[in-house]
Protein backbone atom coordinates (compact mmCIF):
# COMPACT_ATOMS: atom_id res chain seq x y z
CA UNK A 1 0.00 0.00 0.00
CA UNK A 2 1.17 3.51 -0.83
CA UNK A 3 0.09 6.74 0.85
CA UNK A 4 -0.08 9.68 -1.53
CA UNK A 5 -0.97 13.33 -1.29
CA UNK A 6 -3.26 14.29 -4.16
CA UNK A 7 -4.21 17.60 -5.72
CA UNK A 8 -7.87 17.94 -6.66
CA UNK A 9 -7.87 19.18 -10.25
CA UNK A 10 -11.59 19.11 -11.06
CA UNK A 11 -14.96 18.65 -9.39
CA UNK A 12 -18.06 18.22 -11.55
CA UNK A 13 -21.55 17.99 -10.09
CA UNK A 14 -23.07 15.32 -12.32
CA UNK A 15 -26.39 15.26 -10.45
CA UNK A 16 -27.69 16.92 -7.30
CA UNK A 17 -25.82 14.36 -5.19
CA UNK A 18 -23.10 12.79 -7.39
CA UNK A 19 -19.73 14.39 -8.07
CA UNK A 20 -17.06 13.42 -10.59
CA UNK A 21 -13.74 14.21 -8.92
CA UNK A 22 -10.31 14.01 -10.53
CA UNK A 23 -7.20 13.92 -8.41
CA UNK A 24 -3.51 13.94 -9.32
CA UNK A 25 -1.20 12.09 -6.92
CA UNK A 26 2.18 13.63 -6.10
CA UNK A 27 4.04 10.42 -7.01
CA UNK A 28 3.72 7.41 -9.29
CA UNK A 29 0.89 5.01 -8.49
CA UNK A 30 -0.50 1.72 -9.75
CA UNK A 31 -3.61 -0.37 -9.28
CA UNK A 32 -5.70 -3.02 -11.00
CA UNK A 33 -9.04 -2.27 -12.63
CA UNK A 34 -11.72 -2.77 -10.00
CA UNK A 35 -9.62 -1.84 -6.99
CA UNK A 36 -10.38 1.04 -4.64
CA UNK A 37 -8.51 3.64 -2.64
CA UNK A 38 -8.96 4.87 0.91
CA UNK A 39 -9.36 8.58 1.57
CA UNK A 40 -7.43 9.32 4.77
CA UNK A 41 -9.52 11.58 6.99
CA UNK A 42 -7.20 10.92 9.95
CA UNK A 43 -5.03 8.06 11.21
CA UNK A 44 -8.01 5.99 12.34
CA UNK A 45 -10.55 7.10 9.73
CA UNK A 46 -10.03 5.90 6.17
CA UNK A 47 -12.93 5.81 3.72
CA UNK A 48 -13.12 3.58 0.59
CA UNK A 49 -13.97 4.80 -2.91
CA UNK A 50 -13.73 2.84 -6.15
CA UNK A 51 -11.56 4.26 -8.90
CA UNK A 52 -13.56 4.97 -12.05
CA UNK A 53 -10.48 5.59 -14.19
CA UNK A 54 -8.31 2.80 -15.57
CA UNK A 55 -4.79 1.70 -14.67
CA UNK A 56 -3.64 2.89 -18.10
CA UNK A 57 -4.59 6.47 -17.25
CA UNK A 58 -1.39 7.38 -15.45
CA UNK A 59 -1.93 11.11 -15.02
CA UNK A 60 -4.97 11.17 -12.77
CA UNK A 61 -7.51 9.15 -10.79
CA UNK A 62 -11.25 9.66 -11.25
CA UNK A 63 -13.73 9.12 -8.42
CA UNK A 64 -17.54 9.20 -8.45
CA UNK A 65 -18.73 10.31 -5.02
CA UNK A 66 -22.38 10.17 -4.01
CA UNK A 67 -22.63 12.77 -1.26
CA UNK A 68 -25.88 13.97 0.28
CA UNK A 69 -27.47 14.73 3.63
CA UNK A 70 -28.42 11.06 3.92
CA UNK A 71 -24.84 9.95 3.19
CA UNK A 72 -22.81 12.03 5.61
CA UNK A 73 -19.94 9.52 5.38
CA UNK A 74 -19.23 10.55 1.77
CA UNK A 75 -20.39 14.14 2.27
CA UNK A 76 -17.60 14.74 4.79
CA UNK A 77 -15.09 13.66 2.13
CA UNK A 78 -16.63 16.01 -0.43
CA UNK A 79 -16.61 18.85 2.10
CA UNK A 80 -12.87 18.35 2.58
CA UNK A 81 -12.25 18.15 -1.17
CA UNK A 82 -14.13 21.39 -1.79
CA UNK A 83 -12.47 23.15 1.14
CA UNK A 84 -8.84 22.02 0.84
CA UNK A 85 -8.56 21.06 -2.87
CA UNK A 86 -6.34 18.19 -1.82
CA UNK A 87 -6.66 14.82 -0.10
CA UNK A 88 -4.44 12.01 1.14
CA UNK A 89 -5.15 8.49 -0.11
CA UNK A 90 -3.98 4.94 0.50
CA UNK A 91 -3.79 2.92 -2.72
CA UNK A 92 -4.55 0.21 -3.83
CA UNK A 93 -7.07 -1.96 -1.96
CA UNK A 94 -9.41 -4.80 -2.85
CA UNK A 95 -9.32 -8.25 -4.44
CA UNK A 96 -12.27 -7.85 -6.83
CA UNK A 97 -10.10 -6.71 -9.72
CA UNK A 98 -10.42 -7.71 -13.37
CA UNK A 99 -9.13 -11.21 -14.06
CA UNK A 100 -7.19 -12.03 -17.21
CA UNK A 101 -9.57 -14.57 -18.77
CA UNK A 102 -10.31 -12.37 -21.75
CA UNK A 103 -12.44 -14.89 -23.65
CA UNK A 104 -15.03 -15.64 -20.95
CA UNK A 105 -18.28 -13.68 -21.25
CA UNK A 106 -18.58 -11.05 -18.55
CA UNK A 107 -21.46 -9.56 -16.59
CA UNK A 108 -21.03 -6.29 -14.69
CA UNK A 109 -23.65 -5.35 -12.10
CA UNK A 110 -23.74 -1.94 -10.43
CA UNK A 111 -26.12 0.22 -8.47
CA UNK A 112 -25.77 4.00 -8.37
CA UNK A 113 -22.18 5.16 -7.93
CA UNK A 114 -21.11 1.51 -7.87
CA UNK A 115 -20.81 2.24 -11.58
CA UNK A 116 -17.34 3.66 -10.87
CA UNK A 117 -16.13 0.13 -10.06
CA UNK A 118 -17.78 -1.29 -13.17
CA UNK A 119 -16.50 1.51 -15.41
CA UNK A 120 -12.83 0.85 -14.67
CA UNK A 121 -13.27 -2.87 -15.34
CA UNK A 122 -15.34 -2.31 -18.49
CA UNK A 123 -12.92 0.13 -20.13
CA UNK A 124 -9.92 -2.03 -19.27
CA UNK A 125 -11.57 -5.21 -20.54
CA UNK A 126 -12.53 -3.54 -23.83
CA UNK A 127 -8.98 -2.24 -24.27
CA UNK A 128 -7.67 -5.79 -23.89
CA UNK A 129 -10.30 -7.43 -26.09
CA UNK A 130 -12.57 -5.01 -28.00
CA UNK A 131 -14.84 -7.87 -29.09
CA UNK A 132 -15.42 -9.46 -25.70
CA UNK A 133 -18.98 -10.45 -24.83
CA UNK A 134 -19.85 -8.05 -21.97
CA UNK A 135 -23.22 -7.13 -20.49
CA UNK A 136 -23.45 -4.30 -17.97
CA UNK A 137 -26.52 -3.94 -15.76
CA UNK A 138 -26.74 -0.53 -14.10
CA UNK A 139 -29.54 0.11 -11.66
CA UNK A 140 -30.86 3.25 -10.02
CA UNK A 141 -33.98 4.50 -8.33
CA UNK A 142 -34.64 6.97 -11.15
CA UNK A 143 -33.20 7.55 -14.62
CA UNK A 144 -31.17 10.56 -13.43
CA UNK A 145 -29.16 8.24 -11.17
CA UNK A 146 -27.72 6.53 -14.27
CA UNK A 147 -25.56 9.58 -14.80
CA UNK A 148 -23.14 8.22 -17.44
CA UNK A 149 -25.61 6.24 -19.52
CA UNK A 150 -24.73 8.24 -22.65
CA UNK A 151 -21.08 7.15 -22.34
CA UNK A 152 -22.14 3.52 -22.11
CA UNK A 153 -24.45 3.78 -25.10
CA UNK A 154 -21.67 5.36 -27.16
CA UNK A 155 -19.34 2.50 -26.20
CA UNK A 156 -21.94 -0.06 -27.25
CA UNK A 157 -21.98 1.43 -30.75
CA UNK A 158 -18.22 0.88 -31.04
CA UNK A 159 -18.18 -2.58 -29.48
CA UNK A 160 -20.73 -5.05 -30.88
CA UNK A 161 -20.13 -7.46 -28.00
CA UNK A 162 -21.17 -4.88 -25.39
CA UNK A 163 -24.78 -4.85 -24.21
CA UNK A 164 -25.97 -2.06 -21.90
CA UNK A 165 -28.99 -2.80 -19.69
CA UNK A 166 -30.21 0.20 -17.66
CA UNK A 167 -32.71 -0.63 -14.91
CA UNK A 168 -34.72 1.84 -12.82
CA UNK A 169 -37.04 1.19 -9.91
CA UNK A 170 -39.28 4.23 -10.39
CA UNK A 171 -39.56 4.89 -14.14
CA UNK A 172 -40.96 8.11 -15.52
CA UNK A 173 -43.21 8.30 -18.56
CA UNK A 174 -41.27 7.49 -21.70
CA UNK A 175 -38.63 5.32 -20.00
CA UNK A 176 -37.42 2.77 -22.56
CA UNK A 177 -35.18 0.66 -20.35
CA UNK A 178 -35.95 -2.07 -17.83
CA UNK A 179 -37.95 -1.63 -14.64
CA UNK A 180 -37.29 -3.29 -11.29
CA UNK A 181 -33.96 -4.48 -9.91
CA UNK A 182 -30.72 -5.41 -11.63
CA UNK A 183 -30.69 -8.88 -10.11
CA UNK A 184 -34.15 -9.65 -11.49
CA UNK A 185 -33.02 -8.42 -14.91
CA UNK A 186 -29.98 -10.72 -14.86
CA UNK A 187 -32.11 -13.72 -13.92
CA UNK A 188 -34.62 -12.91 -16.66
CA UNK A 189 -31.91 -12.67 -19.30
CA UNK A 190 -29.79 -15.72 -18.46
CA UNK A 191 -30.87 -19.32 -18.13
CA UNK A 192 -27.36 -20.24 -17.01
CA UNK A 193 -24.39 -18.27 -15.71
CA UNK A 194 -21.99 -21.21 -15.60
CA UNK A 195 -19.60 -19.74 -18.18
CA UNK A 196 -19.67 -16.11 -17.03
CA UNK A 197 -17.31 -13.99 -15.00
CA UNK A 198 -19.55 -11.79 -12.83
CA UNK A 199 -18.45 -8.55 -11.15
CA UNK A 200 -20.77 -6.92 -8.63
CA UNK A 201 -20.69 -3.47 -7.01
CA UNK A 202 -23.42 -3.00 -4.45
CA UNK A 203 -24.47 -3.21 -0.85
CA UNK A 204 -23.57 -6.30 1.15
CA UNK A 205 -27.16 -7.55 1.22
CA UNK A 206 -27.48 -7.21 -2.56
CA UNK A 207 -24.20 -9.03 -3.14
CA UNK A 208 -25.23 -11.88 -0.84
CA UNK A 209 -28.60 -12.29 -2.57
CA UNK A 210 -26.84 -12.24 -5.95
CA UNK A 211 -24.39 -14.94 -4.91
CA UNK A 212 -27.13 -17.15 -3.47
CA UNK A 213 -29.47 -16.78 -6.45
CA UNK A 214 -26.87 -16.96 -9.20
CA UNK A 215 -25.15 -20.04 -7.78
CA UNK A 216 -28.27 -21.98 -6.77
CA UNK A 217 -30.59 -21.06 -9.66
CA UNK A 218 -28.25 -20.28 -12.57
CA UNK A 219 -25.21 -22.49 -11.85
CA UNK A 220 -22.79 -19.58 -11.52
CA UNK A 221 -19.33 -20.55 -10.28
CA UNK A 222 -18.64 -18.94 -6.93
CA UNK A 223 -14.95 -18.67 -7.81
CA UNK A 224 -15.90 -16.55 -10.86
CA UNK A 225 -18.03 -14.15 -8.81
CA UNK A 226 -16.16 -10.99 -7.82
CA UNK A 227 -17.07 -8.08 -5.57
CA UNK A 228 -15.56 -6.26 -2.62
CA UNK A 229 -18.54 -7.29 -0.49
CA UNK A 230 -17.56 -10.96 -0.72
CA UNK A 231 -14.54 -10.33 1.50
CA UNK A 232 -16.96 -9.56 4.34
CA UNK A 233 -19.97 -11.86 3.82
Swiss-Prot record:
UniProt GO cellular component terms: cytosol
Gene3D superfamilies: Nucleotide-binding domain of ferredoxin-NADP reductase (FNR) module, Translation factors
Catalyzed chemical reaction(s): reduced riboflavin + NADP(+) = riboflavin + NADPH + 2 H(+); reduced riboflavin + NAD(+) = riboflavin + NADH + 2 H(+)
Coiled-coil stretches: none
Name of one Pfam family that matches: NAD_binding_1
Enzyme class: oxidoreductase
InterPro entries attached to this UniProt entry: Cbr1-like_FAD-bd_dom, FAD-bd_FR_type, FNR_nucleotide-bd, OxRdtase_FAD/NAD-bd, Riboflavin_synthase-like_b-brl
UniProt cross-references to PROSITE patterns, sorted A to Z: FAD_FR
EC number from the UniProt entry: 1.5.1.41
Residues the record lists as binding pyridine: 111-115
A Gene Ontology BP annotation from the UniProt entry: iron ion transport
Chain ranges of the FAD-binding FR-type domain: 2-99
Recorded GO MF terms: enzyme activator activity; riboflavin reductase (NADPH) activity; riboflavin reductase [NAD(P)H] activity
SUPFAM superfamilies, alphabetized: Ferredoxin reductase-like, C-terminal NADP-linked domain, Riboflavin synthase domain-like
NCBIfam families: PRK08051.1 (NF005963)
Subunit note: Monomer.
Family, per entry: Belongs to the Fre/LuxG FAD/NAD(P) flavoprotein oxidoreductase family.
Protein name, UniProt field: NAD(P)H-flavin reductase
Lineage: Bacteria, Pseudomonadati, Pseudomonadota, Gammaproteobacteria, Enterobacterales
Amino acid sequence: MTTLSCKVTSVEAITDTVYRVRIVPDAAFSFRAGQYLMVVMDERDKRPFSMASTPDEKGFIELHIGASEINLYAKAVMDRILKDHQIVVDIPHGEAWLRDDEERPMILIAGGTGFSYARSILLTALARNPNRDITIYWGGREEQHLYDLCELEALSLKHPGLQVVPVVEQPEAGWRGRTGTVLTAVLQDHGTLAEHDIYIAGRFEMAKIARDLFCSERNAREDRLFGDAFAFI
